[in-house]
Amino acid sequence: MEKILGIDVGTQGVRLVITDDKGNILDEVSREFKFDDGRIEQDPNVWWQSILDCLKNIKTRCDDLVSISVTSTSGTIIPLNSDNKPIHNALMYSDDRSSKEALEIEATMNISMKSSYSLPKMLWFKNNFHEKYKDIDKWVHATDFIIGKLTGVYKITDYTNALKSGFDVSNLAWNDVSKIGLDINNFPKVVEPGTFISFIDPNLSNYLNINNNIQIVAGLTDGCASQFASGAIGLNQWSSTIGTTLVLKGVTKKIISDKIFYSHRHPEGYYMPGGASNIGGDWISKWYRNDELDNLNSYAQEFYPSNDFIYPLLITGERFPFYNSEAKLIDNKNLNKEQKFLAGLEAVGYIEKMAFEKIEKLTGSKIEKIYVAGGSTKSKPWLQIRSSILNKQILITKNPNAAFGAVLIAASKTIYNSLSETFENMVEIKEVIKPDESSVIYQDLYKEYIDWLEVNMNRKDLII
């Protein structure tokens, strides 16, 4: 039996998953980090020590382990010296100290840039740590650092991680970073996710007492890994993840030319556009206790569809599927607790439908089914409400998480010949939800909701 290992380095901890070549999980282990505040910076050596601890505690024997890949946060960057040692903590994706540099890059290089991206963090580091900057030999992403620890090869990254460091995914080349005073020689070689990098470092395999012919392959960002694990791997397939926010990701033949999307490069040559709303599921934990959710879901199951409207945005500003910097919560004080809960579930469904209508118009392709993931999948009535509002099938895979996405990438060029073949053999659909009789009613309610939203926002341009 051939085995595959996926490693996910998250913000709060690491998770390792071992599967067989059919996607069955044989073992998984995790460790939490103990940072006081890891949102701005983290010590990457802590990541590695946590992974080593996990590797030493895996119960399943690794004798038949064929390949390993890694996924981690998108936009996190680490400066290394010539000895491959960090000369500073990892600058995390959630570090927004480089907002000024992001604006400078946009003006100078004419490319879209945000403070959450890694390229402005590099420029910020140069501007604020002059002496340390002189010692930089290479910039590596979080994924690259762990792969370097596994192999001794640090200066290779993948398409998905390189995107936010200034890599042009259309031309497969670095943009001219010399325009902002950075040295391209410090930037890594870029390869497809799943590309063979090296066999495991012999010293590491001896230390762990595992075989030394394990292939380590290029990884990918956690968002892309989760997308693949959710099932959206092939052309015109889309995933929708509702956690704190609503995130849509898909696979298209051509890049989507719209400022509210950014696009990764798919391992098989397609593009992977994504968009993220500020609406999601955060309002549930803000407004309700966990011990209330069973009763609230029971109410929603019994009384949907409703004709109550709210807009459950907890922050100011919306970015997708429409841009409105002044958007804010629109509440309805006349609703009781249960009614407001149901109205919130439906509101997110309406925004999700608006987003997919925008995607269908921009791509010219009809989307028949949607793969879903995130905390929202725990609510059965919400899944049914979303399916009926969208008027599309919703599919849930067995293991829709980033670590399993790393497993799929690890298998895609070692055990199998492509990501598509890997999907056919390793991804299992756990549940399919179809629109029910409420779908007809929801189509009319959706139109009413958009009209209501436009009136309350004093906007007439929400629909493209």
Describe the residue ranges of each PLM region.
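Core-facing hydrophobic residues within beta-strands of well-ordered domains
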Residues: L65, N185-F187, I367
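Short beta-strand-loop/turn "lid" adjacent to the catalytic site in phosphate-handling enzymes
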Residues: K56-M92, K114, T143, I147-D168, ...
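N-terminal glycine/serine-rich phosphate-binding loop of ATP-dependent small-molecule kinases
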Residues: M1-H88, D135, S205-A218, L390-I394, ...
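A conserved helix-loop-beta module that forms one wall/lid of the active-site cleft
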Residues: K179-T195
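Carbohydrate-associated surface elements
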Residues: D95
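Active-site core segments that coordinate phosphate-bearing ligands/cofactors
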Residues: L5-G6, S99, L103-K114, L123-H141, ...
